[in-house]
């Protein structure tokens, strides 16, 4: 599978997870200029700067290993790190997301008065992959993309929108726009015998030479797809597809769960935009053996914060996306009994992570959930259903299968067959 995406997004992450569940190998090409990419992903910039597979071997650069002039030092104050020449600060060192690792994301070089005049970007393999020169207003006017030997390979003249490719043989080439650069690179990287999964409809004209039978378009929802359907063999819904009426040529990936890979853990998740979560306090007290993870995008009201004293409660106000993803993968129970709108399509994500939905018919966020045996009329009935699962963990997988059957979630075998046809050009 060859995935073409405009950038790394949540939808791309979800598509990759679905393909992983199906055991489908894939490569990713993002049509932007990122330089900090994993080994299976390439961009317009890395296509030119990382030709050698050895360029994708290494680890992030430790801040003390930065190459600086003699007698210069790297100083750290808390999470603030900078380069010091003995008299004054010469640069900020911005660390990667895992701050405790003390590895370098970028270096912001100062001119006069600590005004940032250029930025060096370091990738996950430990070498400088990009340098940006800035105007007095702090905007980049020239982006320079480097290879591991620190040779300038691709120059982006930002204000003009042009690109200059510098080759070792001196046969430099000018691209008048990013679109021209995209087209030139894609013509070289498009596979001859792989299925192509396109996530950017603006590039449909670029991939028109790909046989329709090997081309699929990945969408986040089912809106405004009629024109695209005529140009591809399949449309794959990766985000907003659960519970929709089935349509020819449109395949839902969202909700896919591999039941055999799941195992029961007495961990429950509720994602809420309101402090009104019916029955939550009773459940917390009734089931001390279950850890309840309560998450929200904002601060929490007292009805939730008052539960913090319970040993089996964990609160996550202002939860990050990464932590949310961690909880989805570690919990086996999802509570859909909160008032207000659903956050982040969390019940759907819970389903595809093998969580059993428990909730109240008066509160569930999708009408079809009311057909599930674990969605009840009262808190007392919900507690009885939860008690059964806790006493008989072997019932967990059967409940997950029941959910998939009643909600008509994607079937792994059917999707495996679909991708097999795409790869073979018979879809």
State each model region's role.
Residues 333-406:
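Catalytic binding pocket for nucleotide-activated donors in carbohydrate/polymer assembly enzymes
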Residues 248-306:
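Conserved catalytic-core segment of nucleotide-activated headgroup transferases in glycan assembly
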Residues 302-319:
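Nucleotide-activated donor-binding/catalytic signature segment of Leloir-type glycosyltransferases, i.e.
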Residues 168-267:
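Catalytic core of nucleotide-activated saccharide and alditol-phosphate transferases
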Residues 69-181:
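Repetitive, compositionally biased segments used for assembly/scaffolding
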Residues 298, 316-327:
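Conserved active-site histidine-acidic residue motif and adjacent donor-binding/catalytic loop
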Residues 1-68:
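N-terminal subdomain of nucleotide-sugar transferases
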Residues 405-427:
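C-terminal alpha-helical cap of glycosyltransferases
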